[in-house]
Structures are given as C-alpha cells and as structure tokens.
Amino acid sequence: MPAYHSMLMEPDTKLIGNMAMLPIRSQFKGPAPRETKDTDIIDEAIYYFKANVFFKNYEIKNEADRTLIYITLYISECLKKLQKCNSKGQGEKEMYTLGITNFPIPGEPGFPLNAMYVKPSNKQEDEVMRAYLQQLRQETGLRLCDKVFDPQTDKPSKWWTCFVKRQFMNKSLSAPGQ
C-alpha cells in the first residue's frame, strides 16, 4: 500500500523555502491564505495520519508533501500530550501551549528534517515561515482535540492514542527523550 500524498498543490501556490504555504481554514492569525474549499491541508493530514504514520520512508512528490510531513509529525507530538489529558478542555489548553511554544524551523539546529527542507533565504522569509508553522500548529491542535476526545466520556479515544508510540519516517519534532 503506498503512502498518501497531498492533492492540494496548485501551480500558483506560494512557497516558503521548499515548503508550500497552502491556504487553511483558521481562526488563528497568520500569513496563510484563507481557505474557501471544504478540505485544507490540516484536514488532509489528520485524515491520512493513521495510514501514513506507519511509513518509515516517504517519497516527496511536491512541496505540499513537505507541509503534510510537518503536520503529520506535529500530530504525533500532539497525541503524546493529549493521551495524558483528562478532558477536552485540558487538551485544548495543552494544544494551545504546544502551538505557541518556541520551536525550531528549517535551517536551525534541532529541526529534525533539515536534510529535506530548505532554510529560509532571508529574515523576512524566516518570519513568514515561523508564523505559518505556528498558525498550522495552533489550528492542527484545536482540530485534533475535536477528533481525539470522545464527546460522551470527554476522554481521549484509544483509536487515536494507540498511535503515540509510532514515529512517521523514524522522526520526531521533539528532542530525544521528550
């Protein structure tokens, strides 16, 4: 079974580094264009997460795949936090904190995918990339809470938390031991 790739790459999609800056439906402020379609890159990443997380190798077919990879790895980080939460409210607080926490971007030490991502070419691109990734992180965390928490019990679903130990591409956005 092949891995799933992003279908959202358009010829006029803006790039930051070699990563696509795709439109998203977001309530958070940031540089991402507003999405008008039903499905955006975050929906796609959440939908394909359970299938893609099993792959140790992933062929990058376009720049949108790099965005998909980042979100997939971020979802893994979110699940580590959400499995310890007792309610959706607590999970949303954890996701907000994780979303705004200082994080490395391509080209910085500590970014696990420097071999696949090009660092920003100047200070302005650096700021746009950091703001875009933060916007992705915040919106992904919020949407993931809606998927992970069971509305009846207000507890994390085992059908999501069972993926905590899985590492997509043998990579993690967090430092070793965290």
UniProtKB/Swiss-Prot annotation:
Main localization (coarse): cytoplasm
Keywords: Actin-binding, Cell projection, Cytoplasm, Cytoskeleton, Nucleus
InterPro entries xrefs: ARPC3, ARPC3_sf
Cellular location(s): Cytoplasm, Cytoskeleton; Cell projection; Nucleus
Example GO BP: Arp2/3 complex-mediated actin nucleation
Family in the record: Belongs to the ARPC3 family.
Name of this protein: Actin-related protein 2/3 complex subunit 3-A
Taxonomic lineage: Eukaryota, Metazoa, Chordata, Craniata, Vertebrata
